[in-house]
Amino acid sequence: HGQSEESIGTNSADQYFAFARDCAFVDATGHQANDFQVTNGFWSDLDRLAVKFEEADKFVVLPGYEWSGNTGMGGDRNVYYATEDRQIRRSSHALIEDKSDLDTDCNTAAELFEALADNKEWDVVCFAHCGGRYADVKMAHDGRFEKSMEVHSSWGTFEWLVQDAFEMGYRVGIVANSDGHKGRPGASYPGASLFGAVGGLTCLLTDELTREAIMDCLRKRRHYATTGGLGGRMVIDVTARFDGDATLYHDDPKIGPAEGRSATEAMMGDIVHFPDGSAEIDVDVLCPEPIERIDIFNGLDLVETIRPYTQDELGNRIRVVWEGAEYRGR
């Protein structure tokens, strides 16, 4: 996702979708304009463009917007819909002259989730996002809608966001996106102001390329994130096998009624209750560039680091690496 000239960016929304499909060669994208800049006319235009560019089995467009409340109100959230012609619930009308639908505003992230629930919009999927106003998931989160944390974009890398979620016991997926403002979704590069990183990509594990399948994938957290660029289209397959019977869920049973089924195997994104026995996890990683290391975490705890080389193969060169956010935010 990203933005275009109608909100805060360059090139039109029409050119934005064309770039994603024809230049970045991504399979799916969404447009996430700051809500306080989205007029009702532009909201209708985005619906029209979603219909124009949507083509089953070739290119999927997810209607949506960025709920753009300040961090003190909950911070940025990406909101995606399964259909067009939906009610946009803005954080404010700050830059919109037409105030006729001011009563639909949700001034906090908690109010947004409450409004979605009150109106039974269970098909909506939200991501916690770090853009102009980083998300505070400890202040507001609703697992019925907010399925994932965005850990990388053109703004930088934000592993602390998913760490916050794990500290709170949330069961969430991980995504990465462009969020550039130059109209280049899927191929966003540094070069403007605070956008100092290559935009990220998300691999979506689905059987078919349709909007329904993509939304189902997002709800079930069957995806993973990369930091984009030349090595950003790696293939990762994760399978867990149990030596006893387990109960598998797609929805978190801790936050409400959830249908479970018996299983001896699980895939990426599944929630599993496994009271006894042991589990074996198989991970396959295919990468277009050499792999430096694979870190395996259990929540916040680093369990093991795997390096595909031996000490003798290192040679006599020293590599100096530094990483991590300079400060909480972007």
What does each model-found stretch correspond to?
Residues 1-330:
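Extended, charged catalytic domains and RNA/DNA-binding interfaces, predominantly
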